[in-house]
């Protein structure tokens, strides 16, 4: 038998913090991947890849697809990046893979890294050069 609802609404008040926590968790997850993408936007070609994907799909582009487009762009332009930009990109990817946020790790792994690998796999020498740039967690994935 369920407990009767308190006249003063205290049970409802007790439920509110749980709902608020869910909103906070969802907001943090969204901020985590958006912050990650914002970090990559410091590289012009990745900003253009993001803009092109959003132009094609709209602002509500599936996140994994967006990350896949970013991975494809990294692979296609790998040799054009300066050593500093390359290090920045792969350090950012590794930070994403080491993040506490499970959603961010999933987007980086199943979107960005899988797309990066699919593109690089066609050229063994490129794949080898990229693997040298990957951090331990990214390489293990």
Regions found by a protein language model. Give the residues of each.
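A contiguous, surface-oriented mixed alpha/beta subdomain in the mid-to-C-terminal portion of proteins
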Residues: 48-64
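N-terminal amphipathic/basic-hydrophobic helices that include classical n-h-c signal peptides
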Residues: 1-29
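Amphipathic alpha-helical binding modules
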Residues: 103-141
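HEAT-repeat alpha-solenoid elements in large eukaryotic scaffold proteins
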Residues: 63-72
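Amphipathic alpha-helical scaffolding segments comprising HEAT/armadillo-like alpha-solenoid repeats
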Residues: 87-90
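Eukaryotic alpha-helical solenoid repeat scaffolds
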Residues: 32-36, 121-122
């Amino acid at each position: 038998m369920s407990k009767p609802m308190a006249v003063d609404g205290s049970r409802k008040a007790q439920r509110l913090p749980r709902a608020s926590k869910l909103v906070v968790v969802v907001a943090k997850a969204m901020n985590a991947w958006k912050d990650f993408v914002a970090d990559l936007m410091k590289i012009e070609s990745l900003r253009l890849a993001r803009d092109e994907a959003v132009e094609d799909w709209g602002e509500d582009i599936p996140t994994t697809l967006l990350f896949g487009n970013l991975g494809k762009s990294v692979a296609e332009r790998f040799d054009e990046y300066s050593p500093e930009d390359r290090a920045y990109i792969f350090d950012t990817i590794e930070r994403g893979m080491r993040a506490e946020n499970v959603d961010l790790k999933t987007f980086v792994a199943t979107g960005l890294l899988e797309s990066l690998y699919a593109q690089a796999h066609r050229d063994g020498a490129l794949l080898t050069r990229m693997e040298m740039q990957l951090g331990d967690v990214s390489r293990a994935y």
